[in-house]
Amino acid sequence: MVLEAVLLGIVQGITEFLPISSTAHMYILAKLLNLHVPGRFFLSSVQLGTSFALILYFFKDVKGIISETSRSIYSFIQFGIRQKQGKRNEYTRLGLLLVTGTIPVVLLGFLLVRFVPDGFFSAARNLFTMGVALIVFGLLLGFADALFRRKKGNIFQITFIESVLIGAAQVFAIIPGVSRSGITITTARFLNFDRQLAVRFSFLLSLPVTFIGGMYGLVAGPDTDYYSLGYSLIGAIVSFVVGLLVVSALLRIISKTTFVLFVYYRVLFGLFLVIVSFF
């Protein structure tokens, strides 16, 4: 049990931030190693673990966004004052961009949950669908990364329309194999973000959705999760530590190279799943 929780926590910590789909890997690992498929409570716990890893790594950004956005909104409401461009206003703009990027995925997510039959989500969780999603969206990442050269390297170059598009793209991540970070990074690269800005914005944009989603999963009520509170806590701690290391490593890697290795991995892993699905 402890080993299973640790193993699943490691997989979540690695795959949550890499553009290779954490959901697909968690599901496949459980199936291949004959582990118990994690329930909502465990998945929410390890998701929160990686969320806290992001908060710690980007603590300066998160603190600046909260404090400066609040300060700017208060100043504007009270005095009609707008700040000039600068470090403080960078945090204010980033905060507003994250809000506009979060709104569409929340609305679209609500509509999907409300109107799409539960059978759709169950049907999507199969080897063939995951394999195809890994391949198709992996090729899209490779195409965007190779074709669209870096142009936008700072927050002030991002428009609110672009933040809405990137935020809305997250809805595709309901399909196992797509990858939330993968689709947002891909969209950002199509919009000519440089790699570091694409990854930074993608990670920060994920925080509201993953944190709120993780908290909701914990308080939504008991489920039939095989993993108890203790094992879920172990998984969360492991995913936090591993996630922190992966975020740091990824940001160093993409400053020196492209996403091509992730594209190759997605295509090969996707082909493997498609082939296995026929047996």
Swiss-Prot record:
It is found in: Cell membrane. It comes from the Bacteria. Pfam families: BacA (PF02673). The keyword Hydrolase applies. One of its GO terms (cellular component) is plasma membrane. Keywords: Antibiotic resistance, Cell membrane, Cell shape, Cell wall biogenesis/degradation, Hydrolase, Membrane, Peptidoglycan synthesis, Transmembrane, Transmembrane helix. GO terms for biological process: cell wall organization; peptidoglycan biosynthetic process; regulation of cell shape; response to antibiotic. It is an enzyme of class 3 (hydrolase). It catalyses: di-trans,octa-cis-undecaprenyl diphosphate + H2O = di-trans,octa-cis-undecaprenyl phosphate + phosphate + H(+). This is Undecaprenyl-diphosphatase. Its EC number is 3.6.1.27. The lineage of its organism: Bacteria, Bacillati, Actinomycetota, Actinomycetes, Micrococcales. It is a multi-pass membrane protein. One of its GO terms (molecular function) is undecaprenyl-diphosphatase activity. Belongs to the UppP family. Catalyzes the dephosphorylation of undecaprenyl diphosphate (UPP). Confers resistance to bacitracin. The chain crosses the membrane at residues 1-21, 39-59, 96-116, 128-148, 155-175, 201-221, 231-251, 259-279. Bacitracin is thought to be involved in the inhibition of peptidoglycan synthesis by sequestering undecaprenyl diphosphate, thereby reducing the pool of lipid carrier available.
